[in-house]
Swiss-Prot record:
PROSITE patterns: ABC_TRANSPORTER_1 (PS00211), ABC_TRANSPORTER_2 (PS50893), MALK (PS51245). It is found in: Cell inner membrane. Part of the ABC transporter complex MalEFGK involved in maltose/maltodextrin import. Responsible for energy coupling to the transport system. Keywords: ATP-binding, Cell inner membrane, Cell membrane, Membrane, Nucleotide-binding, Sugar transport, Translocase, Transport. GO terms for molecular function: ABC-type maltose transporter activity; ATP binding; ATP hydrolysis activity. Its EC number is 7.5.2.1. The keyword Ion transport does not apply. The gene is malK. One of its GO terms (cellular component) is maltose transport complex. This is Maltose/maltodextrin import ATP-binding protein MalK. Belongs to the ABC transporter superfamily. Maltooligosaccharide importer (TC 3.A.1.1.1) family. It is a peripheral membrane protein. It comes from Vibrio cholerae serotype O1 (strain ATCC 39315 / El Tor Inaba N16961). The lineage of its organism: Bacteria, Pseudomonadati, Pseudomonadota, Gammaproteobacteria, Vibrionales. It catalyses: D-maltose(out) + ATP + H2O = D-maltose(in) + ADP + phosphate + H(+). The complex is composed of two ATP-binding proteins (MalK), two transmembrane proteins (MalG and MalK) and a solute-binding protein (MalE).
Amino acid sequence: MASVTLKNVCKAYGDVLISKNVDLEIQEGEFVVFVGPSGCGKSTLLRCIAGLEDITSGDLYIGEQRMNDVEPSKRGVGMVFQSYALYPHLNLYDNMSFGLKLSKADKSEIKKRVDHAAEILQLSHLLDRQPKALSGGQRQRVAIGRTLVSQPNVFLLDEPLSNLDAALRVQMRSEITKLQRKLGCTMIYVTHDQVEAMTMADKIVVLDAGFVSQVGKPLELYHYPQNRFVAGFIGSPKMNFMSVFIEGVEKDRVQVQLSNGTTFWIPVDGTTVTRGERMSLGIRPEHLVEAEHGDAKIEGKVMIVEKLGNETQVYMNLKGSDSDVIYRQPDTLDVETGDTLTIGIPAHRCHLFHSDGRACRRLHKEKGVDLPA
């Protein structure tokens, strides 16, 4: 195990800056997920840590050693790619031991490591088979096993589940999480899927256009996003946003006016808010409530209803507004397309964002997570 530290790291291809002034500390044994949309620089950053890409400026440390100029093979990292990259003519044992054989490791040591990795990954009964005889999930476990036998200080995984179907992705993400907990290893995992990030990580790093937008525990990012980008990216379905007018401001609350004229107070830090300002109110679909239980009411025409059995998702167009809202309830709702529906907004679950995307600090304490300072 080893820690990983990035200090003001930048990566450019010619004049195009991909990773921008990244400062990050990853502790020994921590499971960290880099997440963000396509093109945000998450895989590039991972490849810089692995040594597959040169760092343009800044410093990378693994443990106490500066790694900028150290060869990839000497960094003590193991990488699992999106592609399994297995040798089709070799059986599982030979695929997993290939790197150790190249390094001329002792045969008994090779067997010991491969057998141990196969036992952990539940592949012991498949070691004599070739990759073509395996399922996608089994092939991915072999790719992980090949990295595991090298006993790296840091595991790097670049979207390893992208080639799997939905059901297998759910199974494999739990297996990878259990493996990381069992080994206690430092693991950095790249994905564009925020559900993977929320369910697997000790700490999430959200990247936006090469910048680190926010770093924190999953529930910190969910309940206390620092900006509108993180608020909209974390959570599924994504957060609802609607334009509001600021009617009143106090130190620990802000009064907003909705497009339908309704006003109510939101418990957020008001020290950065100006009366008369236009801001953006955010509320998650699962935090909307029945009309009688809200501090404010909104009405809209039902456009789409998704009845999933365990929950219902209703897509609405708000009356007197161009805004669309998603309403999510853990039950089957008696509502159909074309209906008019009135729902409630609970003030303590609201988020408030400035025009530049900065969030006002929420003052409501959510369960399972500390209030940000």
